[in-house]
A protein has these predicted regions:
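Cyclic nucleotide-binding regulatory module and flanking cytosolic helices
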Residues: 1-46
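Conserved short histidine dyad/triad with adjacent acidic residue
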Residues: 40-55, 74-76, 84-87
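A cytosolic small-molecule/anion-sensing beta-strand core signal
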Residues: 45, 63-64, 85, 107
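Short beta-strand segments in beta-sandwich/barrel cores
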Residues: 49, 66-71, 110-111
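Glycine- and acidic-residue-biased ligand/ion/polar-headgroup-sensing regions
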Residues: 57-70, 86-87
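Cyclic-nucleotide recognition modules
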Residues: 80-135
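Short, Lys/Arg-enriched N-terminal segment that forms or immediately precedes the first helix
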Residues: 89, 139-150
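Phosphate-/nucleic-acid-contacting segments
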Residues: 154-201
Length: 201
């Protein structure tokens, strides 16, 4: 069964709804195990990008690795919407057409890809799975909305310290320009923040 037990090597806590023991127990049912193992998966090398194209209803489950959702802002500059480590759902950024954003692997990664039709197939097999998946997706969306609101109230240095506290593994895996984009600063500003925190000046 393709379910990672080593679920958050990048330091970020796993999805609070997606307890691995629960899914493993549920997939003890042969039909559900075949369903889950039969869902399409995509392997991405570090730096490789993947676009959902016209499939706006696509959602992904990150099995291994660390991914970023990347989009272009109104000025055409690339921005990182969020990072997604293993054992997290990855959903489209709100308000963006499917063709306007992409998924980019920060390290070698594997993601499971699912659309509305496949979610409905889960409902036919076991309504609990369908309800659980929807609950997990809503929880992930809410988490990202809360983070966006929180980011607006934080200074760039406070955002960096938040990442350092919650997901220190990102700092070794994510290229500086991607981390700077996520924090809403330039590469130079991020270097200054790091130097100031290191030296105290």
């Amino acid at each position: 069964m393709n379910y990672p037990l080593e679920i958050h090597p990048a330091g970020q806590a796993p999805c609070t709804v997606c307890e691995p023991g629960w899914l493993i127990s549920l997939c003890a049912d042969v039909r559900m195990r075949h369903y889950w193992d039969g869902l399409p998966r995509i392997n991405l090398a570090a730096g490789q990008a993947w676009c959902t194209g016209a499939e706006s209803d696509t959602v992904c489950w990150v099995e291994t690795g660390l991914l970023a959702t990347v989009f272009a802002d109104a000025q055409g500059r690339e921005r990182v919407h969020h990072f997604h480590s293993a054992a997290h759902w990855l959903t489209p950024p709100f308000g963006l057409p499917a063709q306007d954003w992409r998924i980019e692997a920060q390290v070698p990664s594997r993601l499971l890809v699912m659309n509305d039709l496949q979610l409905e197939e889960a409902k036919v097999l076991d309504k609990r799975v369908h309800d659980w998946m929807l609950q997990a997706l809503m929880a992930e969306r809410q988490r990202l909305i809360q983070r966006e609101h929180q980011w607006l109230m934080f200074s760039a240095a406070e955002r960096y310290l938040k990442v350092l506290q919650e997901a220190p593994g990102w700092l070794e895996l994510v290229p500086q320009h991607r981390l700077a984009s996520y924090l809403g600063v330039t590469d130079v500003a991020l270097s200054r923040i790091r130097r100031r925190l290191k030296t105290g000046h």
